[in-house]
Amino acid sequence: MVRCIKGLKGIKGAGALILAFSLTFAYPAVSWAVETEASEGTVTYGPGSYVVGEDILPGEYAVFTEDTSEQNAYSTCTITLYKDDTDARRIGTFQFQHHGLISLYKGQHLVITKGYAVEADRAGITPGTTGMYKAGRDMEPGTYRITPLTSGSGYYALYNDVRYYYDYIDEYAALFEPVTVNIANGQYLELFDAGSIERVPD
């Protein structure tokens, strides 16, 4: 699923900013719930190469699939993040179902291979069966029951940060049957091939 991607050099500075603004309408930021939309005036960063602090501001971003079909909850987006623009130190290549979340820091190099990015606080994310969610912003903290789409096909993961992902993972499990998960305020939930998620009494 995850593959190494070399940088797509060439979209820097003003060119990246122009591309970002031009893609605002080409790639409307929609969440899993179709009635939710990104805040008006949100800048959208399409496929390309971005140096954080030059081409894109530091901060937390949501990366969405470009698929706008009714089945887009199960479509993917792919990004690669490097520690700097030399590409010598790759943090990782990440693929998300529908959308993922990532924190970007000044000097890092982001390559969006498939999908587009918007500021997470302006992305209008609402809970769904795939993607990533921050408790306290995108969903309510609490206890949830997660049911797989089909037995063994999916997984869930909890993170305390979205900088380097696996260094900050709190919990991970494959979905063979319904599971109950407690999600604390500020934690991040990732869902892949879940069939349903519902709030249950704590």
Describe the role of every protein-language-model region:
Residues M1-K9:
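N-terminal secretory signal peptides that target proteins for export/translocation
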Residues A16-A26:
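Bacterial N-terminal signal peptides
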Residues T24-G41:
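Sec-dependent signal peptide cleavage junction
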Residues G46-G48, V52-E60, G131, A135, ...:
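A glycine-anchored, Pro-Gly-centered beta-turn/N-cap motif
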Residues V51, A88-L104, K134, Y165-A184, ...:
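Beta-sandwich interaction modules
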Residues D67-D85, S151-R163:
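Short, surface-exposed beta-strand/strand-loop-strand elements in extracellular ectodomains
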Residues L101-K114, V181-D193:
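Noncatalytic modules at the cell exterior or secretory-pathway interfaces
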Residues Y116-M132:
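A short "linker-to-beta-strand initiation" element
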